């Protein structure tokens, strides 16, 4: 799906692969800065949580930005297009690993408050 202003406005978290994605979003929607995370940035922070500990989805961006406010070069996932099968495998593994951390270490229960602020489940 094409990313639109409406999607950006409605999204609680925006996970991007490359710095060009983050820069493109922030150029047009600077107010989104606290919701835009590199997938690898989120994965790196989540990997540091003790085994069995999860965080609620509504605190993901805040947790990641508190521990790793700026994505590091290793947080970006390279586009493998035109770089061969080996590059595609590396990219697929990075995506799989980071999504696995999101699935294992983030609780996706809860809801957003009408004000747009997120709150824990009651």
Q: What are the residue ranges of the model-derived segments?
A:
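Short polar/charged helix/loop
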Residues: 1-122
């Amino acid at each position: 799906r094409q990313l639109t202003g409406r999607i950006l406005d409605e999204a609680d978290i925006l996970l991007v692969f490359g710095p060009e994605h983050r820069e493109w979003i922030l150029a047009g929607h600077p107010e989104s800065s606290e919701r835009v995370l590199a997938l690898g940035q989120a994965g790196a922070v989540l990997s540091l949580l003790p085994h069995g500990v999860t965080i609620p989805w509504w605190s993901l961006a805040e947790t990641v930005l508190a521990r790793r406010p700026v994505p590091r070069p290793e947080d970006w996932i390279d586009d493998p297009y035109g770089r061969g099968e080996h590059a595609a495998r590396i990219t697929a593994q990075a995506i799989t690993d980071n999504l696995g951390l999101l699935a294992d270490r983030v609780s996706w229960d809860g809801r957003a408050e009408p004000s747009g602020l997120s709150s824990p489940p009651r």
